[in-house]
Regions:
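A basic/glycine-biased coupling hinge at the interface between accessory DNA-binding modules
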Residues: 1-94, 119, 139, 195, ...
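Conserved motor-region signature of P-loop NTPase helicases/translocases
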Residues: 16, 90, 96-97, 101-263
């Protein structure tokens, strides 16, 4: 309906793309008027600005809010209504935010408003684990925390209790190359452990084949199947691994999920 009213070619401007841009703008507290000003003379941005404005008009007409509005409208309410802000500052005197490196601008504004009176704010995060920029996360929230809250006390949690020394040495050598980070060095009292081996493969098929064969070789030399674990980033990656395990009669169990073909 919005695209029809704004004469948008949905073959060129996909609805999902338009909604994503609008969502990103709201995460930055950029409302339709400001979005249009920022567009300048850019044809594409002006088209999106037109859609954004109509989208908001349709939302108002239907007395509706989208997910991003739940934060945007809350921030606007707290900024413009001192009595409401005072009420919630009294209600939430102590605030803790986890995974702070993944917060966006509107979330930062909300936390700042709520903590503005008593300043009892504790945030926990790791700038080296910031991976959600594509989803609107603003790394400056954690990097500039001491500037925004000058009386803050920073506690670095650099000791690792889970990993062996060699794992941390590799981790430090990798994250040291990150841009925009707070300097830190992970360390442990644990043993050095086995050296890390790095193998790269041309295809996911080759990778799964190598892993399955490696497990077979280890068990042939006396190791147990239960001595092995395979970590993967996304659930879809388990398919090829499971195929290889089944083909080579390797017993396995999916932890924290279900077998690929049972989904």
């Amino acid at each position: 309906e919005v695209c029809r009213k704004t004469d948008i070619d949905t073959k060129r401007f996909k609805e999902r793309m338009l909604l994503s841009v609008i969502s990103s703008a709201k995460n930055e507290m950029i409302l339709p008027e400001e979005f249009e000003l920022n567009a300048g003379g850019d044809f594409v941005q002006l088209k999106i600005a037109k859609v954004y404005k109509e989208y908001e008009a349709q939302m108002r007409a239907n007395n509706a809010l989208d997910f991003d509005d739940l934060l945007v409208k809350t921030v606007q309410l707290l900024e413009t209504q001192p009595d409401v802000r005072e009420n919630y500052q009294e209600r939430f005197r102590y605030i803790m935010v986890d995974e702070y490196q993944d917060t966006n601008t509107v979330q930062f504004r909300l936390v700042s408003l709520l903590a503005g009176k008593y300043r009892n704010l504790c945030v926990v995060g790791d700038d080296d684990q910031s991976i959600y920029k594509f989803r609107g996360a603003n790394i400056r929230n954690i990097l500039d925390f001491e500037k925004e809250f000058s009386d803050a006390k920073v506690i670095k949690l650099e000791q690792n209790y889970r990993s062996v020394g060699n794992v941390l040495e590799v981790a430090n050598s990798v994250i040291r190359n990150n841009k925009g980070r707070k300097e830190k060095t992970l360390w442990t009292d644990n043993e050095k452990g086995e050296k890390i081996r790095l193998r790269q493969f041309d295809t996911a098929y080759d990778e799964a084949q190598f892993i399955a064969e490696d497990i077979k070789d280890e068990t042939a030399q006396g190791a147990n199947y239960s001595d092995h674990a395979v970590l993967y980033r996304t659930n879809a990656q388990s398919r090829l691994l499971e195929e290889k395990f089944v083909a080579m009669n390797i017993p396995y169990k999916i932890v924290g999920g279900i077998n690929f073909y049972s989904r």
